[in-house]
Amino acid sequence: MAEFVRAQIFGTTFEITSRYTDLQPVGMGAFGLVCSAKDQLTSQAVAIKKIMKPFSTPVLSKRTYRELKLLKHLRHENIISLSDIFISPLEDIYFVTELLGTDLHRLLTSRPLEKQFIQYFLYQILRGLKYVHSAGVVHRDLKPSNILVNENCDLKICDFGLARIQDPQMTGYVSTRYYRAPEIMLTWQKYDVEVDIWSAGCIFAEMLEGKPLFPGKDHVNQFSIITELLGTPPDDVIQTICSENTLRFVQSLPKRERQPLSNKFKNAEPQAVDLLENMLVFDPKKRVRAEQALAHPYLAPYHDPTDEPIAEEKFDWSFNDADLPVDTWKIMMYSEILDYHNVDAAAQEQENNGS
């Protein structure tokens, strides 16, 4: 039985195994507190995320289960990886991942990014998205604070708690407004992997300009700002709007022409602007896909089709429509954690035998 140690962080009890020391708070999210720590086993710095009251409601239990399943399944250099997971005696769940020094939001608010960094960061975001999308997963909440970066400029996408299955009937209202694709705002359903490309385009534009591209005060204002730059959505896109109120609102807007992005991004190189034009397209079906974007001339210095892997198998979303009581989610979670440790131990043993 692992020995647990308690510490108070921001008035919250952190109850972790003695394997981890030097706890320091690094961030507070809606669903958990994150601390940095030192892993005594590997001597590496790690991030430990405490999921607050994971078994308080069926909705929270399912959300935690989904994040755990995704972290276990997604294994890629540009996706945050799970290094440990445990349930404390108080029945809180802790995810342990690698620790990266900063995130893109902090970088963007501290100084302008040089061209080669913008290029390299965008390449890594798209490389990660190619993999995630090939697994049948849509992130849905891509924004600068969910993109972690270390001192070597290695980049990893994190926070898959909101991620969902690729499903033509998707519903919801999730990503931070500035980075939210118009089809989420307009229909609240029928969206797919293209929403992440829109978000990546907004992040790309912010790296080029040093400030958010579409800083809307609310949904209506957000959409208005988008149309000022990209023009009124084409009729065939407007026809896909399911909500009567939204349809009336969009039809009431003055007709606007799309502005050439080269007028707004005067200091950006033409290839960067061309790629951005292909990412920020109203019609999701005409928006560039991650693997197409990786092959764009702007990313030629980094593009290597032999080193841009896809997932070996699709993520299993069969649990996602389940409406289960907390106790059942708890049993399923325990089972996943046991499986994680068994697989991890088997891999370690194989590594030891092979060396």
Swiss-Prot record:
Q: What is its EC number?
A: 2.7.11.24
Q: How is it modified after translation?
A: Dually phosphorylated on Thr-171 and Tyr-173, which activates the enzyme.
Which keywords does UniProt give here?
Activator, ATP-binding, Cytoplasm, Kinase, Nucleotide-binding, Nucleus, Phosphoprotein, Serine/threonine-protein kinase, Transcription, Transcription regulation, Transferase
Q: What positions are modified (Phosphotyrosine)? A: 173
Q: Which residues carry this modification: Phosphothreonine?
A: 171
Active site annotation, chain numbering = 141
**Pfam hit, one:** Pkinase
GO CC annotation terms, alphabetical = cytoplasm; nucleus
The short sequence motif called TXY sits at 171-173
Kindly list the GO molecular function terms attached to this UniProt entry.
ATP binding; MAP kinase activity; protein serine kinase activity
Question: Which cofactors does the annotated protein need, by name?
Answer: Mg(2+)
Q: What class of enzyme is it?
A: transferase
A GO biological process of this protein is: stress-activated MAPK cascade
The annotated modulation of its activity is: Activated by tyrosine and threonine phosphorylation.
- Tell me where it resides: Cytoplasm; Nucleus
Against Gene3D superfamilies, the record matches this protein to: Phosphorylase Kinase, domain 1, Transferase(Phosphotransferase) domain 1
Its chief place of residence is: cytoplasm
Xref: PROSITE patterns: MAPK, PROTEIN_KINASE_ATP, PROTEIN_KINASE_DOM, PROTEIN_KINASE_ST
Please state what the annotation says regarding this protein's domains. The TXY motif contains the threonine and tyrosine residues whose phosphorylation activates the MAP kinases.
Purpose of the protein: Proline-directed serine/threonine-protein kinase involved in a signal transduction pathway that is activated by changes in the osmolarity of the extracellular environment. Controls osmotic regulation of transcription of target genes.
Provide the protein name: Mitogen-activated protein kinase HOG1
Organism encoding this protein: Alternaria brassicicola
Instruction: Write the gene name.
Output: HOG1
